[in-house]
Amino acid sequence: MQVPRVKLLMGSGAMFVFAIIYGWVIFPKILKFMISKQVTLKPGSDVRELWSNTPFPLHFYIYVFNVTNPDEVSEGAKPRLQEVGPFVFDEWKDKYDLEDDVVEDTVSFTMRNTFIFNPKESLPLTGEEEIILPHPIMLPGGISVQREKAAMMELVSKGLSIVFPDAKAFLKAKFMDLFFRGINVDCSSEEFSAKALCTVFYTGEIKQAKQVNQTHFLFSFMGQANHSDSGRFTVCRGVKNNKKLGKVVKFADEPEQDIWPDGECNTFVGTDSTVFAPGLKKEDGLWAFTPDLCRSLGAYYQHKSSYHGMPSMRYTLDLGDIRADEKLHCFCEDPEDLDTCPPKGTMNLAACVGGPLMASMPHFYLGDPKLVADVDGLNPNEKDHAVYIDFELMSGTPFQAAKRLQFNLDMEPVEGIEPMKNLPKLILPMFWVEEGVQLNKTYTNLVKYTLFLGLKINSVLRWSLITFSLVGLMFSAYLFYHKSDSLDINSILKDNNKVDDVASTKEPLPSANPKQSSTVHPVQLPNTLIPGTNPATNPATHHKMEHRERY
């Protein structure tokens, strides 16, 4: 039985082409299409529910820099810092007052963060530890007045001495008081300078202060931010254009900010950091608007990574070098004067928060080496202080992330305020925070079995088809080669039979040398019948036929 070589060749070739086109072109497009239809912020969708009410808390860590030599620093000495932490909190995020705009394909919402102290994870710390930090009201207030309203320095100095009697440049207080419960601000004095100073509390300019009665306030770094509005966003839902999913369109009902000198720095780039569009390319980066910095930040691809056995991409970010990067000059106080730009690895938050604060990576990681040298007690390293995100591009899922940021006081001596007149000029770290998330198996399995299982099946199928098709192509090539290099055995047998038939009809030839033959051969008569005779009964004829057959 012969194998149909042509059919085998055509079938194997078709299988090979199908495996290539389906496995690398058609299936990925089908998968991306299915994901794009599922991953939207359309009301009623699973993604919308997870996005609006995160069903699990994020981990929020606070590390505080305790100043161990406050009196010496007040006289100009180099600060010695002791890192205390982490104080661990469960951070719950939810969005409320949602309003959809079907025509614009957007949804507006108010973001709310709630911090709940986790005593078990914080051990051995309890939150009642006493910390020494720069006075959070007196130092920023005095420095701001000196820079912006020097003519009011005498009035402010007198008011501070009344509101904070016997105050020093550094304040010793419990951690929970400094960050959540609040330190007391007494505005009960009727003295003009004190009343003038307290005006900023009554008008709400000091956002970290909470009024408890007509004459007293409580100031804390994060107390007012706990379980309260952190801004109103308007973002794209991604129904009409999935590539715009989560893109910030407005913040505080404004299409752009009015904070920085240049319009480019005031634009919103990226999402609200709680959702990302699927199908991103690794070189696109992960951009998000951060209200705490009044700025959009972009994480860039670093290397491949994995999470619970699933492949992902590792992204990282830093604050860059504003002075060296022309695109970032709009974050300088004066874009035309580079001397007003902050040092490498830092960002001036004065325009954003209204005080002499600087943002940086923890321990000034990736910052100007001078920043680290100006104080004792810092040890910047990638493992503990870098920002990272392990991200799955096709589904737009962040598997794990750690967003880290340090807040520093841009400190300088203040001549008009006695406790501050000898302070050194430097950027003093106060505390840094980490907002982290690690998806558990409940949520990673959703990605694993809806995305990676399909990809695995497709991979097995396409490579199996390619293997079978290559085997078929090689076997058909072998058959074609065998056909051209050898003769078919049946054809050989048929040719031999034809030769035998032809040979049986031919007469023997006379010997070329009569001397070598002792037999006399009779003369062959023509094969015709003589009239009146029958060769079957003619003895002579019969004798001749028998004689010929013997030869």
Curated annotation (Swiss-Prot):
It is found in: Cell membrane. It comes from the Eukaryota. Disruption phenotype: Mutants are viable and fertile with no gross morphological or locomotor defects. It is a multi-pass membrane protein. Keywords: Cell membrane, Disulfide bond, Glycoprotein, Membrane, Olfaction, Receptor, Sensory transduction, Transmembrane, Transmembrane helix. Disulfide bonds join C265-C330, C294-C352, C332-C341. Glycans are attached at N66, N213, N226, N440. GO terms for molecular function: scavenger receptor activity. Residues 1-7, 481-551 are cytoplasmic. Its main location: membrane. The chain crosses the membrane at residues 8-28, 460-480. Residues 503-551 are annotated as: Disordered. PANTHER family: SCAVENGER RECEPTOR CLASS B TYPE-1 SR-B1 (PTHR11923), SENSORY NEURON MEMBRANE PROTEIN 1 (PTHR11923:SF69). Plays an olfactory role that is not restricted to pheromone sensitivity. Has a role in detection and signal transduction of the fatty-acid-derived male pheromone 11-cis vaccenyl acetate (cVA). Not required for sensitivity to general odorants. Acts in concert with Or67d and lush to capture cVA molecules on the surface of Or67d expressing olfactory dendrites and facilitate their transfer to the odorant-receptor Orco complex. Essential for the electrophysiological responses of these olfactory sensory neurons (OSNs) to cVA. Not required for the development of trichoid OSNs and support cells. Belongs to the CD36 family. This is Sensory neuron membrane protein 1. It comes from Drosophila melanogaster.
